[in-house]
Amino acid sequence: MKARAGGSAASGGGRPEALAALRAAGGRVDEFTTPPVGHEGPRVPPLAARGRLALTRDELAAWGERFGRAAHAPLVVTLAGDLGAGKTTLAQAICRGYGVTEAVTSPTYALVHQYASPRGPVYHLDLYRLEDPRELENLGWDDVTTAHALVLVEWPERAAGRLPAGHVPIDLEHAEGDAERRVLLAG
């Protein structure tokens, strides 16, 4: 799994909130950058800094739960990666951390699932089957991505430039061996 965080405050889920969520979720986020000259010890990286983690499926789930606990709506999180990279696994974990108690399933055929949480609604979208970004209108894209909610978007590249500013992109990939995912935190 590769994880990237970035964006601006324009969507309400801006950089400070995204960084705070990543710091709380990652636990080791501050290990990803070399401290500047004259600075003692590790520092929390700016969103433009890069870092990688290799996580097992269980570690990915634990990381996702911590991320969900730290997340604050409104927040749009995109989950990109090949089939089987762990997008739905991570979405399930984020939802658990956010307080969703019902089973979270892949919205591949329904395209969007809505879940209730004591902290507010969660929308989980899977854009894999979209053939044209104009189809987003049929999903209520503008309403969902501007709602005071946690929004998880799988296959965000199908949104072709329609992602809100300030979203948190997380890219997932298989690492060496099938048991691990790579995490990349970058701006």
Describe the residue ranges of each PLM region.
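Conserved lysine of the Walker
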Residues: 87
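Hydrophobic anchor at the beta1->P-loop junction of P-loop NTPases
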Residues: 77-79
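N-terminal pre-Walker A segment at the start of P-loop NTPase domains
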Residues: 46-63
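P-loop (Walker A) phosphate-binding loop of NTP-binding proteins
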Residues: 82
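Short beta-strand-centered segment that lines the nucleotide-binding/catalytic pocket of NTP-utilizing
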Residues: 100-115
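Short phosphate-coordinating micro-motif centered on Lys-Gly-acidic
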Residues: 2-5, 14-18, 22, 26-32, ...
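Phosphate-binding P-loop
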Residues: 69-74
